[in-house]
Amino acid sequence: MELKLAREDLNSKPKTITLEQIEEMVKKSGDKIFYFDRENSHKDLMELVEYFENKGYSVYFREVKYGLDENDYIYEVHILA
């Protein structure tokens, strides 16, 4: 599964990351915070949460609004060992 990381600039394209890369980063540090772009489907992000919960991690997921526009949001995912 490929997910798009949050954009660093409004005009830039989001970078992608795979589930395997996320898992590797979490294994190295024990816990990690990821910010995902709004272009990701909610279903894919729920699959990510479920995947790590099944592996025994605590996962916190929320939508973060950063502006007044309806489309000004990103997804925040905390994965804790």
What are these regions (language model features)?
Residues 25-27, 50, 68-70:
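Sterically constrained small-residue positions within well-ordered secondary structures
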